[in-house]
Amino acid sequence: MILCRGLFMAVIGIDLGTTNSCVAVMEGGDAKAIENSEGARTTPSIVAFTDSEVLVGDPAKRQATTNAKNTIYASKRLIGRRYQDTRDIKTSYDIVSAKNGDAWIKVRDKDYSPSQIGALILEKMKETAERHLGCKVEKAVITVPAYFDDAQRQATKDAGKIAGLDVIRIINEPTAAALAYGLNKSDKQKVIAVYDLGGGTFDVSILEIADGVFEVKSTNGDTMLGGEDFDHAIMEYLMDDFKKSTGIDLHSDAMAMQRIKEAAEKAKIELSSRMETDINLPFLSSDSTGPKHLSLKLTRATFENLVSDLVKRTIEPCKKALKDAGISADKIDEVVLVGGMTRVPKIIQTVKEFFGKEPHKGVNPDEVVAIGAAIQGGILAGDVRDVLLLDVTPLSLGIETLGGVFTPLIERNTTIPTKKSQVFSTAEDGQTAVTIKVFQGERKMANDNKLLGQFSLEGIPPAPRGMPQIEVTFDIDANGIVHVSAKDKASGKEQAIRIQSSGGLTDDEIQNMIKEAESKAEEDEKRKKFVEVKNNAENLVHSTEKSLKEHGDKISNADKLDIENAIRDLKDCISKDNIEDTDTMQNKLDHLMKVSMKLGEALYSNTNNATAGDNNTTDTGSSSNSDGSKVVDSDYQEIDKKDGK
């Protein structure tokens, strides 16, 4: 496939979501979401490992019930996280601790990093864009929740790299939504709130939009609050009801759990437009008395009662975001709803009550983030002009100082990119080395915040404590990714690193995963070719057998035997179902097509003979000339050309 050039030097925008993902691209000055191979503009963020292949999106979702243990969903909740921080996450698949303490996913006998799973979804998005554009895509802008920390942002960028993408920018989801909302609006200056409740995370951002400048004033959120939690609340309700009526606890039954999860998600969606819904799951389990079924009505009122605490949890981040922006709720001109969960009536009502105004519903909550990412891609590519985006860092960044105190160097909601330095000194006499521990968070004590990483500055000349001057510099790039350096002013010794936490993927691991992904792509292409050849072979066998049965008497016995032998050989090859036999199967298919042409020739010959026989029949209403040619008599009417009649 050729590389996109000229007008199609495309930078795609990807919303890598917890529940669904979406890809968009700029076309003719407008950003549009692209349909995938299944005809939908959103793709389930689900990856399934079967015996023979890896499935992504709708095909993975369709087989989840029968392959629950090997079907991975909501992996975004694990990306860039430590195993100890994920113990409350309930899934049908196994979450394990990697050697470095990160949360990874176990499938059969192999462990996968969440970045690898994310890469498979990103590959699907990349393929969707390439199919639409008709050329190869390399560059992308990928969105992340505004409240993602450095490790989560870096892990997302790693996922893009594994997928074969050059991630030229990581952009916050609410900011992307604001870009999509306000790009072509010529209104006066506006202050908007973006309320983004997705499948796995919640963000709220306050932005000021004026004359093409999109300035984020503050952001807040909860990276463990989203639609998955609403689904889980319904699931627990259904399983409690089932246990009360049957005495059976379904928590350890992976297949039953998957069926309940699907039913819970379906019920949640239906209750956005209906007051009640029926949930029927026959043969959900069984005991010595026979099969057990689940059947009940779930009303909107019951659902709202189940999730009331989850809805309330979105309010505190809204309060904090307004406070940090120095704005009261009544000064917000418009509230933009983003994320599929904002279709829930209780959410809409809560937002309306808190902000005191009807929320704006003019954007598609499932596509707006990807569209905003595509616009940002257009800005970076120079296709979209006169637009300036000023984003912020969501959490304070600093280091651990004497007594375990957290000393921030860059406060939360500081506009990025940014750079700040501060001078520190030693805590002991004669100290020749210092360890710089970098943290992110809002707590007063360092250990209560997220440790991003650490490094040492050595070779400091011995001196009384407090005398050496060590300058620590924090640099946050436009992706929100942190770079830190420390320099001893006396000796000039300097140590600089891009923060990589004690977890995270090393460069070698990323390269190995890239090679594995490329290898998988080759295997997938090989599998695809085999399936296509096999399908063609089965179709040809079926049609040839049918033709032979109906018209075999019209060819010689020798030709008939050749066809029968070719059919048998191809059937034998098909029955082996061996991917290594693809070329052999193609050759046998070609041979059957060649020998079966005798059958086609005989059919056409018989048809032509029949037609010739018909032509010897005397026609009525015709006469012959002396040379034997036919003259067809016909009625005619003369037209007076002058009158035009």
From Swiss-Prot:
Please note every region of biased composition (Low complexity): 606-629
Give the range the annotation lists for the signal sequence.
Answer: none
Q: Which residues does this entry mark as bearing Phosphothreonine?
A: 201
Q: Which GO terms describe its molecular function?
A: ATP binding; ATP-dependent protein folding chaperone; unfolded protein binding
Annotated segments matching region Disordered? 606-645
Q: Does the keyword Phosphoprotein apply?
A: yes
Recorded hits in InterPro entries, A to Z, give: ATPase_NBD, Chaperone_DnaK, Heat_shock_70_CS, HSP70_C_sf, HSP70_peptide-bd_sf, Hsp_70_fam
Q: Sorted alphabetically, which Gene3D superfamilies does this protein's record hold?
A: 1.20.1270.10, 3.30.420.40, Actin, Chain A, domain 4, Substrate Binding Domain Of DNAk, Chain A, domain 1
Q: What up-regulates or down-regulates this gene?
A: By stress conditions e.g. heat shock.
**Which keywords fit this entry according to its UniProt record?**
ATP-binding, Chaperone, Nucleotide-binding, Phosphoprotein, Stress response
ATP-binding in keyword set: yes
List where Basic and acidic residues composition bias occurs.
630-645
Record's function text? Acts as a chaperone.
Question: What PANTHER family would the database entry show?
Answer: HEAT SHOCK PROTEIN 70KDA
Give the UniProt family note.
Answer: Belongs to the heat shock protein 70 family.
Q: What is this protein called?
A: Chaperone protein DnaK
Q: Which organism is it from?
A: Ehrlichia ruminantium (strain Gardel)
Source taxonomy: Bacteria, Pseudomonadati, Pseudomonadota, Alphaproteobacteria, Rickettsiales
